């Protein structure tokens, strides 16, 4: 129940991500998808902030350091579903401050013949330290 007292906020509408930083986050999302499709864990690590949190399939996984991103997920996807690549359908900034940004994203997983395996929604949380934006957390409805 909301009290009648004025609610306090952590930031104001004016205190949002700059256009330059928003562009950088969009670039990171493009680089992320390209690295994922190349099956390049090192490139993915370079775009992540550690510790990095992933919420998916009812589990919370914390990657404390680079080099711990298990690529076996993609091996399983290839074996189970014939996964070949993924693509963003939508990447939308939904909340931000000068040092944090929440992106609602939707992506599609495809087989080599172009048929669709599934379409999934996720939330990607970016954080900036000294102007260096990286993906800090991912919460996905996909496997």
Residue map of PLM features:
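Residues that act as N-cap/strand-start positions at coil-to-secondary-structure junctions
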Residues: 28, 87-88, 120
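A short local loop/turn or secondary-structure capping micro-motif enriched for an aromatic residue
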Residues: 63, 71, 110-113, 128, ...
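Short beta-strand segments enriched in hydrophobic/aromatic residues
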Residues: 48-49, 107-109, 139-140
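Exposed beta-sheet edge and beta->alpha loop/turn motif
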Residues: 95-131
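Short, low-complexity N-terminal intrinsically disordered segments enriched in polar/charged residues
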Residues: 1-50, 55
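Short beta-strand edge/turn micro-motifs at domain boundaries
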Residues: 3-7, 117-143
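Short hydrophobic/aromatic-rich beta-strand segments that constitute the beta-sheet cores
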Residues: 54-55, 103, 135-137
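A solvent-exposed, acidic/Ser-Thr-rich amphipathic alpha-helical stretch
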Residues: 41-95
């Amino acid at each position: 129940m909301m009290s009648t007292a004025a609610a306090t906020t952590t930031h104001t509408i004016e205190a949002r991500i700059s256009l330059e930083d928003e562009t950088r986050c969009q670039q990171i999302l493009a680089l992320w998808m390209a690295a994922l499709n190349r099956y390049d864990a090192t490139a993915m690590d370079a775009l992540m902030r550690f510790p990095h949190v992933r919420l998916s399939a009812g589990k919370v996984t914390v990657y404390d350091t680079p080099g711990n991103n298990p690529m076996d997920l993609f091996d399983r996807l290839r074996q189970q579903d014939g996964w070949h690549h993924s693509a963003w359908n939508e990447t939308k900034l939904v909340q931000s401050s000068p040092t944090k940004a929440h992106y609602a994203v939707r992506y599609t997983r495809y087989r080599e013949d172009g048929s669709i395996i599934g379409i999934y929604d996720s939330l990607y949380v970016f954080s900036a330290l000294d102007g260096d934006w990286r993906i800090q957390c991912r919460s996905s409805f996909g496997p």
